[in-house]
Amino acid sequence: MIRIAILSFAHYHANFWAEAFLAEPDVVLAAIWDDDVARGTEAAGRFGVPFVPDLDRAIDACDAVAVCSETVAHAPLIERAAKAGRAVLCEKPIAIDLIEAARIGAAVRDGGIAFMQSFPKRFDPASHELRRLVMSGELGRIGLVRIRHGHFYGLEADFASRWYVDPARSGGGALLDEGVHAADFLCWTFGMPRSVLASASSALGLPVEDQAIALFEYADGMTAEVIASFAFAAADTSIEIYGSNGTALLSGVDLASRDISKGPFLRTFTRDQVVREWTPSPLVPQFKLGWFHHQNAIAFAAALRRGEAPPISLDDGIRALTMIARAYESVRSGRRIEF
């Protein structure tokens, strides 16, 4: 039996993790800790789990922790858990910056613990099919990838008071919070880029950027465009991949498009087709099915049960953050940044 404690409900994804852990065989959600006692007590009551206000006692009560705090708290919480030898599941992004990410890396290595970075798109069959289309060569040589990822919460009145828009606690705005999903897909599928040119602004007047665009250039000539926003009232196509032999378009995989996009969600075209029209796929993105953020928790628990390395690593988290950190450097300097 694996005992897991959730450390903080600051990020709403903790609710999905709790649901997943409670449904998993041979897993016990042993404790909830939160530096906000009212928030932690409410979550514990809702899920029927003990609230443990003392962090060390919460860590002692478990075999593994799931960290879902404000991003700035990731490093200190992981350091405490790693020192106690506890495995860690960490909400994205891994840290507010690369210095904090290095702290986490040192703690994980020194503690010799299992670490899993949360990137839910890694478990979506739609993501795997896009990656297969690239890796198989069906689309030919890839010249351009466009990823638009964002939501509409920035348009709601209370969003300006939430920790997500406090740079001291979140580390950044849409480019970090939303863009890191795109960065991970690019790293996973194409590897690290050669350079980036980026721009960001706060069209809504938030303390962090609510709109951002980053152009990543790869050594083979491919360009990847990432557009991130907190202010998409609605959207459709989320990922576009253009190759020398074909195109793939995917919709419904971000909050801006999830509820408004209609199937087919994945469409492809290859130049060898007799009829020049889209070929629809029957795949429905996991995000549309409502069992999306749960997959990280399920995979984490499964890896611990089997005694295997988690499927998304510390290095995966750091690589995606590195892409975003270099993009921020480009925003600040106004020039292209080499990796």
Language model features with spans:
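C-terminal helix-rich "cap/oligomerization" subdomain common to oxidoreductases
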Residues: 1, 64-67, 299-339
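N-terminal Rossmann-like dinucleotide-binding module
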Residues: 1-46
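Beta-loop-alpha module in the N-terminal Rossmann-like domain of NAD(P)-dependent dehydrogenases
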Residues: 36, 47-107, 292
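Hydrophobic residues in well-ordered beta-strands that form the structural core
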Residues: 53, 89-91, 115-117, 226, ...
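Rossmann-fold dehydrogenase core element
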Residues: 103-121, 141-144
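Predominantly a Rossmann-like dinucleotide-binding segment in NAD(P)-dependent oxidoreductases
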Residues: 121-205, 334
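Glycine-rich phosphate/pyrophosphate-binding beta-alpha loops
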Residues: 180, 227-235
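C-terminal glycine/acidic-rich active-site capping loop/insertion
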Residues: 240-315
